[in-house]
Curated annotation (Swiss-Prot):
InterPro entries: RNA_pol_sigma-I, RNA_pol_sigma_r2. Its main location: cytoplasm. This is RNA polymerase sigma factor SigI2. Interacts with RsgI2. Residues 211-230 bind DNA. A motif (Polymerase core binding) lies at residues 71-84.
Length: 265
């Protein structure tokens, strides 16, 4: 039997072979008990996988991690705890791959926040081979993360949503706004739609952007919506359906761009 709290067990989580299924099932069982309110088990689980958190943070930042004094470690620890609460076995079969992405996302947010004040570490630490998470806003079907079970499963669900709107991933990549500020603005518009239950419901029901209602809420040019319809819909579907892993393919926290002014009507 594999000890779920042992370093050996932890290493086994990176494998997707059948022999690791019992380990993964055991982890899911632990996560479910923690989410059901077992605080002692949560503490034990986090303490047992602190070495995993340290290694993940170190690999992502390219820095030595001092547990006592590292802000990055604190971010990683909080992200691991967040991953426990947000893990959905229906979407993500492997917890540790999911938690790695959550840690990466939170370190990314931390780096962006601190870059406003000082150079904490270069963004290249977060690049994935030839594709940067910061520079590539639209979906890239060829990147390595899509080979994992979790991202593949989420992409499958996402593609079905897109098909309902007559959109393919290939078409989406071609339609993504080229200008940085335009992309940023479209993402903000998409978030407004996704965060508004009435707007998002109408989007899914009519298979189109509710322009009339949206223009009453925001002071934006109608042509901006029309020119970027495909990208705005695609982004709204990610936000509205809580596709957490796919959010890493959208630079949703990118600073700059046009600020959306709310209508006072």
């Amino acid at each position: 039997m594999i000890d779920l709290f042992s370093p050996k067990g932890k290493k086994d989580t990176v494998s997707t072979t059948n022999k690791d299924k019992s380990f993964e099932d055991g982890i899911v069982n632990i996560i479910n008990k923690i989410k059901a309110g077992d605080k002692l088990l949560r503490e034990e689980f986090i303490n047992s996988y602190t070495p995993y958190i340290i290694r993940t943070v170190s690999n992502l930042t390219g820095k030595y991690v001092d547990v006592e004094n590292s802000d990055e470690f604190s971010v990683g620890l909080a992200a691991f705890n967040e991953a426990i609460d947000s893990f959905d076995e229906g979407k993500n079969m492997f917890f540790f791959k999911f938690s790695t992405l959550v840690i990466k996302r939170r370190l990314t947010d931390y780096a962006r926040h601190n870059k406003k004040h000082c150079h904490v570490y270069p963004f290249t630490y977060f690049e994935d081979k030839n594709n940067s998470y910061f520079e590539q806003i639209h979906l890239k079907s060829e990147i390595d993360l899509q080979n994992t079970y979790e991202i593949s499963r989420e992409i499958e669900l996402y593609e079905q949503k897109l098909r309902d709107f007559g959109i393919s991933l290939e078409h989406l990549a071609k339609c993504a706004p080229k200008h940085k500020d335009s992309k940023s603005l479209c993402i903000k518009i998409a978030k407004v739609i996704a965060d508004n239950k009435e707007l998002f419901s109408k989007l899914e029901r009519t298979r189109n952007i509710p322009k009339t209602e949206l223009l009453k809420l925001l002071k934006i040019n109608k042509k901006t919506i029309e020119r970027n319809r495909t990208f705005i819909i695609a982004a709204a579907l990610i936000f509205g359906n809580d596709f957490n892993l796919l959010k890493d393919f959208l630079d949703i926290s990118e600073p700059g761009g046009d600020n959306i002014e709310r209508s006072t009507k």
